[in-house]
Amino acid sequence: MAGICCGVVGETEPAAPVDSTSRASLRRRLDLLPSIKIVADSAVAPPLENCRKRQKRETVVLSTLPGNLDLDSNVRSENKKARSAVTNSNSVTEAESFFSDVPKIGTTSVCGRRRDMEDAVSIHPSFLQRNSENHHFYGVFDGHGCSHVAEKCRERLHDIVKKEVEVMASDEWTETMVKSFQKMDKEVSQRECNLVVNGATRSMKNSCRCELQSPQCDAVGSTAVVSVVTPEKIIVSNCGDSRAVLCRNGVAIPLSVDHKPDRPDELIRIQQAGGRVIYWDGARVLGVLAMSRAIGDNYLKPYVIPDPEVTVTDRTDEDECLILASDGLWDVVPNETACGVARMCLRGAGAGDDSDAAHNACSDAALLLTKLALARQSSDNVSVVVVDLRKRRNNQASS
C-alpha cells in the first residue's frame, strides 16, 4: 500500500524540498489525501462481501448503537446460507428433509437504559430428535444481581432438557421440565459453592461484576422462560416474570403466568414457607426480589423456588407466531400489542416462504418490538424472540 501511495505522489507532484511551515506546503499535502484514499480503497481493500475485517468492524459499530443491539438473527441467517452452500448433491434431499420443519426465528437483545446487560437468549433449532420428529429449543433468561446465572442457563439448560427428554416416558412434559429446572438450579448453586471453596476460575472471576464470591454471589439469580416446539405441541416452562405469548389467528394467548410475589397463590406459598412479601417499590420477597420464582438466589430459599409452571399447547393451523421476551418488553407493551406488531411484520412473508424477506420478517418483528419498548421508556434490558409457526401449515397443505 505504501508503494502505491508513493507512486501516486510521484505522478502528481515532483519531489522537492518543502517547507513544512509554508501555506503552500499544507495545501499540497491536503490535495494529496483524496488521491491516496482512492488508491487504497480501489487497489488494496478486498471485496467487501468477503472481508472478515469489515464484518468485525460492523460488529463493533453495531455494538455502539443505542441499546447494544444483538443481531444474532443475522448471524444465524448467514450460517443457514453457508450450510446450504456446502450441501452436496447426494445429500440435498436428506438435508432438506431435516431442516424443512425448522421455524424461522428472529431475536433481539438490548441493554436499554440499564448500566449492565444481564439478559441472555438461547436458540437451538433441532436440538433433539424424538420419534423421528425435530424438537426446537428457545429460551430467554433475565438475570438480576449479575449476569453469570443467566449466562449459565444459556449455556447449559438446553443440554439438561435434552437429556431429560431422551429418557422421558411418553409425554410427561411437566415432570421433565421441572426436573430440568431443578438440575439447572443445582448446577448454579454447586458452581458458586465450588468456586468459593476451591478458588474461582480466574477468567470467569475477572469477567463477573460480583466476582463470584459470597455473599454477593448468593444474591444472583435469573428468570427463565423456555419453549420446546415440536411438530404437534408447544411446551412452555416459566420461572419468574419473563413471558411467552402465542399469536393464534390474531388473538394473543399467554402461555405463561408471571410469578409475582403478590399473586395470591404465590403469596400464600411464601407465607407458608415462613417468608414475607414487603411492598418496597412494588411487591418483593422480603422486600428484595420482585419475583417469587427464579433460578439461583440461594439467600432467598425456600421462599424463592426454581420450579417452573409448565403448559402444553397443541399446535393448530391458525398458529402464527410465538413471542418469548423478558419483562423489559412486557412491562410496557401489552400482549395484544406485541401480537399485532409481530403479525404486521410477518404478513409480508408468506408461510413456508424461504426468501430473504421471509427470513428477515421475524428479525424485523423482534427489532420493532424492542424499539417500541424503548420508545415507551422501558427501564430494563429488553430481549425478544419471535418464532414463525406458520411453516407447518403449508407443509400440511402440500401433503
From Swiss-Prot:
GO biological process: abscisic acid-activated signaling pathway; defense response to virus; negative regulation of abscisic acid-activated signaling pathway; negative regulation of anion channel activity; regulation of stomatal movement; response to abscisic acid; response to cold; response to water deprivation
GO MF: kinase binding; metal ion binding; phosphatase activity; phosphoprotein phosphatase activity; protein kinase binding; protein serine/threonine phosphatase activity
Binding residue positions for Mn(2+) 2: D142, D327, D380
Any GO CC annotation of this UniProt entry: cytosol
Activity regulation (UniProt): Repressed by PYR/PYL/RCAR ABA receptors in an ABA-dependent manner.
InterPro entries named among the record's database cross-references: PP2C, PP2C_BS, PPM-type-like_dom_sf, PPM-type_phosphatase-like_dom
Domain PPM-type phosphatase, first and last residues per copy: 104-389
SUPFAM superfamilies, sorted: PP2C-like
Lock (site feature) positions: W280
Enzyme Commission number(s): 3.1.3.16
Cofactor binding comment, as recorded: Binds 2 magnesium or manganese ions per subunit.
Top-level division of the source organism's lineage: Eukaryota
Protein keywords: Abscisic acid signaling pathway, Hydrolase, Magnesium, Manganese, Metal-binding, Protein phosphatase, Ubl conjugation, Zinc
Reactions catalysed: O-phospho-L-seryl-[protein] + H2O = L-seryl-[protein] + phosphate; O-phospho-L-threonyl-[protein] + H2O = L-threonyl-[protein] + phosphate
Tissue-specificity statement: Mostly expressed in seeds and leaves, and, to a lower extent, in roots, stems, and flowers, particularly in siliques. Essentially found in the phloem.
Reported function: Major negative regulator of abscisic acid (ABA) responses during seed germination and cold acclimation. Confers insensitivity to ABA. Modulates negatively the AKT2/3 activity, which mediates K(+) transport and membrane polarization during stress situations, probably by dephosphorylation. Prevents stomata closure by inactivating the S-type anion efflux channel SLAC1 and its activator SRK2E.
Quaternary structure and interacting proteins, as annotated: Interacts with AKT2/AKT3. Interacts with ABA-bounded PYR1, PYL1, PYL2, PYL3, PYL4, PYL9 and PYL12, and with free PYL2, PYL3, PYL4 and PYL13. Binds to and inactivates SLAC1 and SRK2E. The inactivation of SRK2E does not require phosphatase activity. Interacts with CBL1, CBL2, CBL3, CBL5, and CBL7, but not CBL4, CBL6, and CBL9. Interacts with RGLG1 and RGLG5. Interacts with KIN10.
Family affiliation: Belongs to the PP2C family.
Protein name as catalogued: Protein phosphatase 2C 37
Biological source species: Arabidopsis thaliana
